[in-house]
Amino acid sequence: MIKVKQLAHVCIFAHDLEATRSFYRDVLGMDTRFNFLRDGEIFGFYLDCGGRSHVEVFQKDAATYSELNQINHFCLEVEDIDAAIAHIKSKGIDVTAKKHACDDTFQAWIRDPNGVKIELFEYTDKSAQFIGGDRIADW
């Protein structure tokens, strides 16, 4: 039997590598761990997501994103969602209002420069992810 330890990384395609790197660094505070090089040129990189988790980014000029993609979004746990929202707004990035979700978490949503949807997530002491129990979806 396989025992999964954790999600290692999520991979996204970028239209503009440096704009994408700047967004994740300046807006979300995610530093580059290393670059992928080919023929002396950077064509991708790994971003530190905390712990042993990462976001992997590769240049792909023709990439498009839509509601039809198999992966809809990825989620980043934050320590303080109110502070995260304030910081993101200070960078001129559109961010949804904080929502208290049916699973007793707080969430807000943004998009990166490539249109990738990112959920920002703060757990509470009552979060279903920790205490279980079915929840009625309100969306």
Label every model-predicted segment.
Residues 33, 62-63:
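Short beta-turn/strand-loop junction motif enriched in small, turn-promoting residues
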Residues 2, 11-54:
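Core segments of cupin and vicinal oxygen chelate
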Residues 1-3, 6-15, 35, 45-49, 64-139, ...:
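Vicinal oxygen chelate
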